[in-house]
């Protein structure tokens, strides 16, 4: 009996120490005073947006941008293949790029050319369906399954890129996840950020870097630039800034396709121009450098434009072959250059984003929530302790010790795994305490019943735990299943509640059944034969 108790007590003490370290961290690094303990606790238990204050954003991913980019690449492949097969056509366009970017129309093609087009599309573009359009035209439409997959991937890639950018800015404990079902939205919560202007700007930039040939400009009016498109096919008009007056918008006629793009970028960093101002210097990948070298050697004397997010940042003459590096000038401040380098290094967003909702929770509101939540938890916990002592006498001490260990395990778990404590999470802690009390009540009432039936204290304890065990398991398993469902389908605060409740219930199974039983056995081991049990 004593041997069994010894190893059980050792297990309980070990669990207590392990999770106590989870709450405060390394004891050697803790200052053992009020402020030191508070600091250690706050470093381990991270507060959520509703407690700490910060910014809540909901973003809409414009997934049609990703579809347009994909169909643009498909159009380039179609043009290349038709040219290789000597098939003529009058035009290849997207009739409704804004609302149906997945549809490509090919006009002015002969029936023989259409046969070649179908063969080429089946081989090179199997994700598109071939069809007939009006007036002898033909269409290629992206299949629904591929279209949905493309949009879903755009959202997941946007989440990853936004997370990388936010992490690089030093925002601690951000929540960045998909929001809603099939709405292509992203939830972003930034605890401790009450002025999100810079973070928003960094998140929203698509960071689409391109280098294209410039055919004309700067023009003071967009219509002047558009006239050049009549003589120069496969060009677009893009806005830029006047070199003499940066506040004035001008326009350039540039090539529709780029020589190199963002995916060819290897590294971006902050540098200095000839006047000591901040600029962004970049290096290209090996493949990008080869293509850039070939392009510049073939266009010596022509103009080259550095384009960021559809705006011409800089135009320069190609004086000689350029290999794998370049600079972006834009009269940047040091902060702007640093942010642009950060964005470029994280990679381009697959689609642009729009802000649907923005809410700022002030720190004062967060502190009020903390005080009210902690006050409610303390009042409830103290009331439970007093009730258990009054109603169950000596056994109430057993229950109270189990509940205290339950809280230590729960908070230690949050410290170890970096779980974020939210206001619903505090509610989960309180509910865990309630479930712990319920487990103890089931056990104690069963022990009382066995004692009234004339059983000895050791036998009553044995029977009480034995009969209450299945009921406790049943209630906890059903509640844990509900918490798992909340975690899978809920958002930030709801997930916090589910995580806190789930682990609290696992801890409760350990404390209510194992720890409480060990305490009873220790008491009975010291009792004289025939001595009554205080319960």
From Swiss-Prot:
Top-rank taxon, per record: Bacteria
Chief location: membrane
Alphabetical UniProt keywords: Cell inner membrane, Cell membrane, Membrane, Protein transport, Translocation, Transmembrane, Transmembrane helix, Transport
PANTHER family: PROTEIN TRANSLOCASE SUBUNIT SECD, PROTEIN-EXPORT MEMBRANE PROTEIN SEC
Family note: Belongs to the SecD/SecF family. SecD subfamily.
Function as written in the Swiss-Prot or TrEMBL entry: Part of the Sec protein translocase complex. Interacts with the SecYEG preprotein conducting channel. SecDF uses the proton motive force (PMF) to complete protein translocation after the ATP-dependent function of SecA.
Protein name: Protein translocase subunit SecD
Organism: Koribacter versatilis (strain Ellin345)
């Amino acid at each position: 009996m004593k041997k069994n108790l010894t190893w059980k007590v050792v297990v309980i003490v070990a669990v207590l120490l392990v999770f106590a370290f989870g709450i405060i961290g390394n004891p050697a690094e803790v200052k053992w005073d009020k402020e030191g303990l508070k600091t250690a606790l706050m470093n381990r238990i991270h507060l959520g947006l509703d407690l700490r204050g910060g910014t809540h954003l909901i973003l809409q991913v414009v997934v049609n941008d990703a579809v347009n980019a994909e169909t643009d690449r498909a159009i380039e492949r179609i043009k290349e293949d038709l040219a290789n097969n000597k098939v003529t056509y009058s035009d290849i366009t997207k009739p409704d790029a804004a609302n149906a970017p997945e549809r490509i129309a090919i006009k002015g093609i002969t029936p023989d050319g259409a046969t070649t087009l179908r063969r080429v599309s089946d081989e090179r573009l199997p994700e598109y369906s071939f069809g007939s359009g009006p007036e002898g035209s033909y269409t290629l439409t992206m299949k629904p399954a591929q279209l949905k997959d493309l949009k879903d991937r755009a959202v997941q890639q946007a989440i990853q890129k936004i997370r990388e950018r936010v992490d690089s800015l030093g925002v601690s404990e951000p929540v960045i996840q998909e929001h809603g079902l099939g709405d292509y939205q992203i939830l972003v919560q930034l605890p401790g950020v009450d002025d999100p202007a810079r973070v928003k700007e960094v998140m929203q930039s698509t960071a689409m870097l391109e280098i294209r040939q410039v055919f004309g400009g700067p023009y003071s009016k967009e219509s002047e630039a558009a006239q050049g498109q009549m003589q120069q096919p496969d060009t677009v008009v893009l806005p830029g800034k006047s070199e003499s007056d940066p506040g004035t918008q001008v326009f350039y006629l540039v090539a529709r396709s780029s020589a190199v793009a963002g995916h060819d970028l290897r590294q971006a960093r902050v540098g200095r121009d000839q006047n000591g101002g901040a600029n962004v210097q970049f290096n290209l990948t090996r493949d990008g450098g080869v293509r850039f070298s070939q392009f510049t050697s073939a266009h010596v004397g022509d103009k080259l434009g550095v384009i960021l997010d559809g705006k011409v940042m800089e135009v320069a003459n190609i004086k000689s072959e350029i290999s794998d590096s370049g600079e972006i000038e834009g009269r940047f401040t040091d902060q702007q250059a640093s942010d642009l380098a950060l964005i470029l290094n994280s990679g381009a967003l697959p689609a642009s984003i729009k802000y649907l909702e923005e809410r700022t929770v002030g720190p004062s509101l967060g502190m009020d929530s903390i005080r009210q939540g902690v006050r409610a938890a303390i009042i409830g916990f103290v009331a439970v302790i007093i009730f258990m002592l009054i109603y169950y006498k000596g056994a109430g001490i057993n229950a109270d010790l189990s509940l205290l260990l339950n809280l230590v395990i729960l908070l230690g778990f949050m410290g170890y795994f970096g779980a974020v404590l939210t206001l619903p999470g505090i509610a989960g802690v309180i509910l865990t305490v309630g479930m712990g009390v319920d487990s103890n009540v089931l056990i104690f009432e069963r022990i009382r019943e066995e004692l009234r039936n004339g059983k000895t204290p050791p036998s009553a304890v044995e029977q009480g735990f034995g009969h209450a065990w299945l009921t406790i398991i049943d209630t906890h398993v059903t509640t844990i299943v509900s918490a798992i469902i909340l975690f899978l389908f809920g958002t930030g605060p709801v997930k916090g509640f589910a995580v806190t409740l789930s682990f609290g219930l696992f801890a409760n199974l350990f404390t209510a059944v194992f720890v409480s039983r060990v305490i009873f056995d220790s008491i009975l081991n010291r009792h004289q034969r025939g001595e009554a049990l205080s319960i």
